[in-house]
Amino acid sequence: MTIRVLVAKVGLDGHDRGIKVVARLLRDAGMEVVYTGLFQTPETVAIAAIQEDVDVVGLSMLSGAHLTLAPMVVETLRAKGSDIPVVVGGIVPNNDLEDMRAAGVAAVFGPGASADDMVASINEVVSRARA
């Protein structure tokens, strides 16, 4: 079964080159990708994820707001009755990883994460969610 991924930029971060590269590599790995574009809110991401019936949400975070915005996306999904897992890629300091996981983020990809590692991790996250 093809994995469906929604990728989004939440908040005011206008840098989209990285998320477009990630979207392409996920497509090349056989995943179906929905890109919501820039300047999304946790609410719009959650609604789109549910409407698109995706298996996982990927957030690109470069603005330093990851400890605020990523948990808000997770909370909004849960409030809407969805258990879609959320993964985050971008600039996330190592000392924030535990807080991200505690907030319900399933995986975090920092600078230098390889395409193979991202694909393998997303496959694993989705496999756990489908089990």
What are these regions (language model features)?
Residues 19-123, 127-128:
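Cofactor-cradling patches in redox/metallo enzymes
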Residues 8-12:
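N-terminal pre-triad scaffold of radical SAM enzymes
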